[in-house]
Amino acid sequence: MENLIANYPINTCENEFMLPIEYLYNKEELSGDIINDLELLNNNNNKNNKNNNNNNKNNNNKSLYDYVFDSDSIFGDAIKGRWSNYYTTDVGFLKDSQKLYESMYDIEMYSINEEKVNDILMTIEDNTDFEERNHYIKDVYLCDKMNQNESLMTWYSCFLVMSPILSLCLPIFIMIMPLFIIKSQGVNISTKEYFKLLFVLMKKIPIGKLLEIDWTNANSIFYAAISVCAYIFQLYQSFSMCLSFRRNMVSGHDMLYALREYLRNTVYRMEAYIGLSKNYESYANFNKDLSDRMKQINGYVDILEDLPQSKYMIPKKIGKIRCEIYKLYTNNAYKEMIYYANNFNGYLENITAIGKKMGKQMTKANFKTRFSNLIGMYYPAIVGDKKANNVQLNDVKINNNQIITGVNASGKTTLLKTVLFNVILSQQIGCGFYKRGKIAVYDKIHCYLNIPDTNGRDSLFQAEARRCKDIIDSVEEHQDKKHLCVFDELYSGTNPYEASATGYAYIRYMSKHKNVKLLITTHYLDMCESLLKAKQKSITNYHMEAYYDEANKMVYTYKKKKGITKIKGGVEVLKNLSYPKSIVKEATELIMGGNMNNSK
């Protein structure tokens, strides 16, 4: 076991496990902008969150990944964040993943106690004064080797257990021992004569004063009482240490026993997983590492195999238990091994959740296509954990550059997020939230969503311009790569006149690159009209449908239609927020008049 552990470098424990996608050569790092703008992760995606409520009332607290990787365990939550690291253009891997996830029903999920193991890890991570609290040898030469010596630990543990008896018998031992020493020297003295002489000598030392207490003298009585109390206190300390040692031994035994059962069941899970994925070439490197780790874990399980099941049988293996507890606390390789097992179990839980959703909420992607075509797609945060029956589905064919207009709250931004999330998801796990999906895999994915009001010293427009320039630089640098660029409200941080002009120029520039596909939302209708007049064949205008009903109330269909919107709906938002009627009326009159010349 020591050799197996020594073969693995000790890095940060949580980062030792890697998802299969991280072993690929053809992988791309997902930018932090996309992760933040799409809200792929949130504070719920960490290993300490035990309250992952799936109730739809709490959907606002869930990240997008929470709808993909359902998790009721600490380990499943802890590993979610790693999925956001990469996406891939390796179609073979994505197809293998689809088959693997579908077959997860065939794997026998041996039960594991995540919370118990997590508590154990928290205990061994807090190893302050560990040696002192657990009565190990410390601050002496070779103490580390001593604490890992099974025979020495057996004798030392026996001494700790016997300490109360030794303390109780020590005075008697002190009185009798000189008799044997004297007789061994050939001195002829009877036992009676020895104790008579001992009694006389002891009267001459302070402790011997107890033998002739003057019960009429307060000082004599006080001295006797102090001496007796000191002896009793010494006995109390010895008994307390013995009880503490026993509690620690029982706790340590329970810890090792729980770890053994957990790691054994984890090995069974690993064997089952390798059996399912062994024929998938793209998983070969992951499986090789997994197999090596499995041997390491199995070796540790074998070491713990002869642990007594009952705490009453601990004395038989007391030295071994002490050594293994010490190694668990002090050897980082053991912690690394447990973390790897935890992360694997979290990964297994995540992909099992995907398998359960495939064919229901999620559908496998088809990658044999020249352009992406998502049919019946939806945004999972709107639907929640139920099937998409009562939500408007949309189709998006990304065979050209698209500009989408529409009134406020008509669903423009949600449409962009839906496309972006489903494309990313399809290039991570091979499926997405749609009825049918054809994905032309993209080498580079860029987004421009939720630009912050300030970026360091930048104004909003400067932050927007900086993000757009970064995208230009990437397109110029990787002209042989396929790019998908998603922009929400392009250049909205400046006045409408300049925003329309710069947006028009930017879109025309980007649309010249045949390897780039643009999806853009905007409120600047004059920019859309200008692009239409310029007869840019690579650009198509769409809008999110909305209309006024007979009661002059805005109705949102959330359907994507061809053409530029003709509806103005900003004032409708003010109505819905119960603005003063005078504000709504004056704003409406100015809009209907087409200018503000008549305002007072």
Give short role names for the model-derived ranges.
Residues 1-13, 61-68, 79-85, 90-93, ...:
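Intrinsic structural disorder
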Residues 2-50, 56-407, 414-444, 477:
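Alpha-helical coupling/stalk and coiled-coil linker elements that connect catalytic or binding modules
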Residues 354-600:
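ATPase nucleotide-binding head domains, primarily ABC-like/P-loop NTPase cores
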